[in-house]
């Protein structure tokens, strides 16, 4: 097992693990499941997961493998390009039963990873860790294994980032009774993104002005800002304004056409219901007296 492996986990995986933990049986202290994703060139990207019902005893582990295989087949039908990449468990540590469970997943995929999510919030945060199993032992002697930590990071697709930003707006001290937050229209999201970008640019300018005035600066941050400045197109102010206005007009046109198509489909559905013939069934049998 190579230790130069890295794991990337999508937010939907964490949400599913927490949901499975909240729905666990009253006598279950730990929840496990299968990780679904891709593995390429030492990078394991986890995009989905599902829970596997199980019971842990002092000397053995009982798992509903038939259920796991059924869910596996359903996932293969939906996305054949992804496969099993490992397994997950709730908690902040590796238990004695982890080696037994990992042995099963070693037969399902090559070099499975083990991800733990601390749903007990030890230390005030939900710790995310990833492990690989390294075999230990001497030749012709007793064999064993050891779980070694590997790098794990969160990664997001662009639609997931939008969803996380909407979820971030619900974080308020209102608790469970707080009202939901709508995603908003496309134009509202563009305005919000522009406002956020303006705030970030102001922070970057303040940092650059402070560094120029002699304040302590970070070399890595300076290189990132320089790369950002070089990546921006060298356009005149009027040319940039015209290009930006043209992009906004295109966006407004797309939003308008989408609303027109939506209205037309709704109207067509109502007209279809009004003009469709009524299906009647004629009973020709002898009535009961």
From Swiss-Prot:
- Pfam families, from UniProt? JAB, MitMem_reg
Key words of the record: Cytoplasm, Initiation factor, Protein biosynthesis
Q: Does the keyword Cytoplasm apply?
A: yes
Cited InterPro entries: eIF3f, EIF3F/CSN6-like_C, JAMM/MPN+_dom, MPN
Give any single GO term for biological process.
formation of cytoplasmic translation initiation complex
A single GO cellular-component term on record:
eukaryotic translation initiation factor 3 complex, eIF3m
The domain of life for this entry's organism is Eukaryota
Instruction: Give a GO molecular function annotation for the protein.
Output: translation initiation factor activity
Q: Where is the MPN domain?
A: 7-137
Predominantly, its location class is cytoplasm
Q: Mind telling me which CDD domains this protein's record contains? A: MPN_eIF3f
Where is it localised? Cytoplasm
What this chain does, per the entry, is described as: Component of the eukaryotic translation initiation factor 3 (eIF-3) complex, which is involved in protein synthesis of a specialized repertoire of mRNAs and, together with other initiation factors, stimulates binding of mRNA and methionyl-tRNAi to the 40S ribosome. The eIF-3 complex specifically targets and initiates translation of a subset of mRNAs involved in cell proliferation.
Query: What family does the database annotate?
Result: Belongs to the eIF-3 subunit F family.
Q: What is this protein called?
A: Eukaryotic translation initiation factor 3 subunit F
Protein source organism: Bombyx mori
């Amino acid at each position: 097992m190579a230790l130069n492996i890295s794991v990337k986990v999508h937010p939907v995986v964490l949400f599913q693990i927490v949901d499975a933990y909240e729905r666990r049986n009253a006598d279950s202290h730990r929840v496990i499941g299968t990780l679904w994703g891709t593995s390429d060139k030492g990078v394991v990207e986890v995009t989905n997961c599902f829970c596997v019902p199980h019971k842990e005893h002092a000397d053995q582990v009982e798992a509903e493998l038939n259920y796991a295989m059924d869910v596996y087949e359903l996932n293969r039908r939906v996305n054949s390009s992804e496969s099993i990449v490992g397994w997950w468990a709730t908690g902040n540590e590796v238990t004695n039963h982890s080696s037994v469970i990992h042995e099963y997943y070693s037969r399902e995929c090559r070099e499975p990873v083990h991800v733990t999510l601390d749903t007990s919030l030890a230390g005030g945060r939900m710790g995310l860790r990833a492990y690989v199993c390294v075999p230990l032992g001497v030749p012709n002697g007793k064999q064993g294994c050891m779980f070694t930590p590997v790098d794990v990071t969160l990664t997001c697709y662009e639609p997931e980032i939008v969803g996380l930003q909407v979820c971030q707006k619900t974080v308020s001290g209102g608790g469970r009774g707080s009202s939901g937050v709508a995603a908003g229209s496309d134009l509202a999201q563009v305005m919000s993104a522009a406002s956020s970008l303006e705030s970030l640019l102001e922070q970057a300018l303040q940092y650059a002005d402070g560094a120029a005035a002699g304040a302590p600066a970070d070399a890595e941050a300076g290189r990132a800002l320089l790369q950002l400045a070089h990546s921006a197109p060298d356009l005149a102010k009027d040319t940039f304004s015209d290009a930006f206005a043209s992009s906004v007009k295109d966006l407004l046109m797309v939003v308008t056409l989408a609303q027109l198509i939506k209205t037309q489909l709704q109207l067509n559905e109502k007209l279809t219901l009004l003009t469709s013939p009524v299906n009647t069934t004629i009973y020709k049998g002898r009535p009961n007296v």
